[in-house]
Each structure stands twice: as C-alpha cells, then as structure tokens.
C-alpha cells in the first residue's frame, strides 16, 4: 500500500509551547504514527500516562529532556531515544528543539 503525502497538517499548543505536525495524516489507523515536533524555548509535551506501546525519537535540532517516570535523559541534535511507554512520559526543552517522533501504536 503506497501513500504519497504532499504536506503536513499541524496543531499548535500555546500552553505547552509546542507544535505537532502529522507527517502522515490519519496515521492513527496504521501500526505507527510519525510526527514532527517543534518545542519552543521552555516548551514541553503534555505528560502522557502509561500505555501499551513503544516510542522513538530523533533530535533534528536543539536538545530535549526525555522524562520517563521519575528519571530524565538528555538527547541532543543527531541523537535518538527509544522507550517502552509503560511509564508516564514527556519531552521538554529549555532552549527549543525539533524532533522526529514515532509512536507505535499511534497515540498522538
């Protein structure tokens, strides 16, 4: 099944200072969901409660803190992260960042 996507669709969250762009619109029906995440200075994602699945991210620019439960890990430009989503989790960035983020199964 081949899909050609011509543009991303997005959503901006003023409260959390982030913007999510769906790289594959309506990917919720697929096995995985890739998004382009822009964290503004001091931005973060809404904390996500534990759920089944796995998440992967690749930092395109800047630095992010990956918060998993009561632990925190740093990932900078060119680095990636991968985790089981069984812990409460979110990303944050002090100075802003861009991330390619993939969730399986879809959760955005």
What function would you assign to each model-found segment?
Residues 8-43, 47, 102-103, 107:
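A short glycine-rich, His/Asp/Glu-containing loop-to-beta-strand
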Residues 1-3:
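Short C-terminal boundary/hinge segments that cap the last helix of small helical domains
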Residues 16-18, 76, 85-108:
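Ligand-binding loop in jelly-roll beta-barrel domains
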Residues 54, 61-63, 70, 86-88, ...:
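A generic structural motif
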Residues 45-51, 91-93:
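Short histidine-centered beta-strand/loop micro-motifs
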Residues 38-39, 50-66:
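Short, conserved beta-strand element in jelly-roll/cupin
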Residues 69-85:
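Short acidic-glycine-tyrosine-enriched beta hairpin
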